[in-house]
């Protein structure tokens, strides 16, 4: 739980006691497709970029590929693999697949993948996320944006490469904020 993981047990306890609030009770308010749409809208408002789903080879039918476009020009791409399944490593993370760099053939655009282990959809019902999972998604997407929006062409320091361990968390924690912002929650 968000509060408990940050040493805010008293806040969590108060939520439960005063409001009978639980993560499970919030799930109907956070269907995964709407969360993604809201996340992409927030990113558009913050950075002026569009996120467009594209056809691409994927390793599992749950995985999807998207590109970031700035005024119609592709600046990077990413894969989302959001749902838990048999044999998949647990946890949530972002990894760079390809970094931005200049090559003899021109600019190589960055690509990353973001992996989570949310409860998958059942039948034709959308997957429902807890608010903690929404925060996790925003956090990992912050890492992804850090990787994809770099304008540095030196692969050794592009994106998250060469960034101190504490500073590498800044963009991801910045994105977490938007999972709490009232105006942003209206988009979710």
Task: Enumerate the predicted regions with their spans.
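Gly/Pro-rich turn-and-neighbor structural signature
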Residues: 10-90, 94, 164, 168
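Active-site recognition of the HExxH zinc-binding catalytic motif
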Residues: 132-147, 172
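Acidic/histidine-rich catalytic neighborhood
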Residues: 6, 74, 150-188
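Short alpha-helical functional segments enriched in proximate histidine and acidic residues
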Residues: 2, 42, 46, 144-148
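Active-site-adjacent "gating/activation" loops or surface patches in catalytic cores
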Residues: 59-60, 67-135
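Glycine- and acidic
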Residues: 19-29, 51-54, 113-135, 150-161
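A generic "alpha-helical surface" signal
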Residues: 2, 34, 132-136
């Amino acid at each position: 739980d968000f509060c408990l993981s940050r040493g805010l047990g008293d806040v969590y306890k108060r939520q439960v006691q005063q409001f009978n609030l639980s993560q499970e009770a919030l799930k109907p308010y956070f269907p995964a497709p709407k969360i993604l749409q809201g996340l992409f809208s927030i990113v558009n408002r913050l950075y002026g970029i569009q996120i467009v789903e594209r056809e691409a080879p994927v390793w599992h039918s749950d995985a999807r590929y998207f590109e970031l476009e700035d005024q119609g020009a592709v600046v990077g791409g990413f894969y989302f693999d959001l749902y838990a399944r048999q044999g998949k490593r647990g946890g949530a993370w972002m990894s760079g697949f390809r970094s931005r760099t200049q090559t003899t053939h021109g600019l190589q655009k960055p690509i990353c993948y973001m992996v989570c282990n949310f409860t998958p959809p059942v039948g034709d019902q959308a997957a429902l996320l807890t608010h903690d999972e929404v925060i996790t998604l925003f956090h990992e997407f912050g890492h992804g944006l850090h990787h994809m929006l770099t304008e540095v062409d030196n692969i050794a320091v592009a994106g998250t490469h060469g960034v101190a361990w504490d500073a590498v968390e800044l963009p991801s924690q910045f994105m977490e904020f938007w999972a709490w912002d009232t105006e942003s929650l209206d988009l979710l």
